[in-house]
C-alpha cells in the first residue's frame, strides 16, 4: 500500500474540520406543560445545536415551556416569554419584532490533538480497527455483538428492508477501489461505571472522555493487544470506534451522547507500546432501529482526516444526501 495515492483523503484533510454528526433531518414530538404536542427539529451538530419550530429557534424555559428564542448569548439562546404553539410566531408577534433572521448560538471548541493516520505508510491493504460496545447500568443494549460484527464486516450486508446496502467494510472497499480494507474487531458489551444520563451531551464531553478511557482500561485488563491497531507505525492506535446503547443526541434527546470524533487529551494512555487517544463514538440505534453504516462510516472518516461537508447554518444543503460527510450519515435510516 505504500505506493498507493489517496488524493481525496489528502485533499480533504487540509480543511478545518468539525468532527461530528449532523442533527437528524426528521422532526420529533415534544409536549408543552398543557399537553399540547409540537413537532420540532434539532439543528446543528455536536459543537453548536438548537431547536426549531416552523423555522424559528426555540428553547425550553425553566418552567418547562417551549418558548421562542429572543436572542443569542454566546453559546446559548435567550428565552422569551412567548410560548410556542400558543402565542403568535415571531413574524406576527410585536414582542419579538426585533428578530430579523436566524438565531444561531456560537460554536463550542472541542480540541482534538490526535494524529491523522498516514495512509501512505500503512502496512498493507487491511486497516485494523478496534470497536468497543458500551452499555449502562440503567440502560442495557438491545442488539447482540454479532449484529455489529455483521454491520461492520459482512460482505453484502443488508440493512433493514433495503437491498444490498453493504457493510462498513464494503463501503470503504468500494470507494477506495479495493485499496482500503477495514477489518473491525468488535468487543463484547462492556458496562459503564455510571448510569446513562451521566454521560449525556448536556453534561459536556469530559465525562464521555473518561468513559472512553475506562473502556480502554477494561479491554487492557482483559488482555487486549492494542499494538495491532497502529496501522501506519506512528505509535498511535489509528481509529478507536465505540458504540453506546441507545440512540444519539443528534435525534433530539440531549441526555444521550452526540456522535462525534475527538481525542482523549490528557486522558490518553499507552498500552502495548502504542498510545490510545483518537476515538469516535456512535449510537446503537437510529430512528428506533439498529444503527446504519452511515454514521459509523462518517465518524470513521473523521479519524482518517475527512471534514464535515454539511452546512451548519442551514443556508444551503451542503454536499447533500449522497455525500457521506454531509447528510449521507443518515442514509438507510428512513430519513432520506
Predicted regions located by residue number:
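General secondary-structure edge motif
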Residues: 7, 111, 280-284
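Zymogen propeptides/activation segments of proteases
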Residues: 19-278
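Bacterial Sec-dependent N-terminal signal peptides
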Residues: 1-22
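A broad, structure-centric signal for solvent-exposed, well-ordered loop/edge residues
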Residues: 8, 37, 45-49, 313, ...
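Extracellular hydrolytic enzyme modules, especially secreted metalloproteases
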Residues: 239-241, 245-336
Amino acid at each position: 500500500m505504500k505506493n498507493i495515492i489517496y488524493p481525496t483523503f489528502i485533499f480533504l484533510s487540509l480543511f478545518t474540520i468539525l468532527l461530528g454528526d449532523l442533527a437528524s433531518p426528521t422532526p420529533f414530538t415534544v409536549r408543552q406543560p398543557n399537553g399540547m404536542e409540537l413537532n420540532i427539529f434539532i439543528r446543528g451538530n455536536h459543537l453548536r445545536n438548537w431547536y426549531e419550530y416552523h423555522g424559528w429557534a426555540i428553547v425550553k424555559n425553566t418552567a418547562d415551556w417551549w418558548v421562542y428564542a429572543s436572542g443569542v448569548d454566546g453559546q446559548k439562546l435567550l428565552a422569551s416569554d412567548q410560548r410556542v404553539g400558543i402565542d403568535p410566531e415571531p413574524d406576527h408577534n410585536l414582542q419579538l419584532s426585533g428578530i430579523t433572521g436566524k438565531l444561531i448560538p456560537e460554536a463550542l471548541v472541542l480540541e482534538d490533538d490526535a494524529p491523522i493516520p498516514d495512509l501512505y505508510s500503512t502496512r498493507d491493504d487491511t486497516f485494523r480497527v478496534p470497536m468497543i460496545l458500551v452499555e449502562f447500568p440503567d440502560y442495557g443494549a438491545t442488539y447482540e455483538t454479532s449484529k455489529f460484527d455483521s454491520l461492520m464486516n459482512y460482505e453484502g450486508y443488508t440493512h433493514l428492508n433495503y437491498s444490498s446496502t453493504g457493510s462498513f467494510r464494503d463501503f470503504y472497499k468500494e470507494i477506495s477501489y479495493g485499496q482500503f480494507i477495514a477489518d473491525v474487531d468488535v468487543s463484547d458489551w462492556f458496562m459503564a461505571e455510571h448510569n446513562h444520563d451521566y454521560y449525556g451531551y448536556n453534561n459536556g464531553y469530559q465525562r464521555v472522555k473518561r468513559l472512553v478511557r475506562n473502556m480502554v482500561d477494561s479491554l487492557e485488563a482483559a488482555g487486549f493487544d492494542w499494538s495491532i491497531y497502529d496501522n501506519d507505525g506512528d505509535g498511535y492506535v489509528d481509529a478507536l470506534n465505540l458504540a453506546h446503547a441507545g440512540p444519539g443526541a443528534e435525534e433530539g434527546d440531549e441526555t444521550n451522547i452526540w456522535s462525534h470524533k475527538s481525542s482523549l487529551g490528557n486522558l490518553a494512555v499507552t498500552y502495548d507500546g502504542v498510545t490510545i487517544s483518537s476515538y469516535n463514538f456512535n449510537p446503537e440505534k437510529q430512528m428506533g432501529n439498529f444503527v446504519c453504516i452511515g454514521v459509523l462510516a462518517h465518524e470513521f472518516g473523521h479519524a482518517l482526516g475527512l471534514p464535515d461537508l454539511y452546512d451548519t447554518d442551514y443556508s444551503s444543503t451542503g454536499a447533500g444526501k449522497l455525500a457521506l460527510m454531509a447528510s449521507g450519515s443518515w442514509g438507510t435510516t428512513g430519513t432520506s
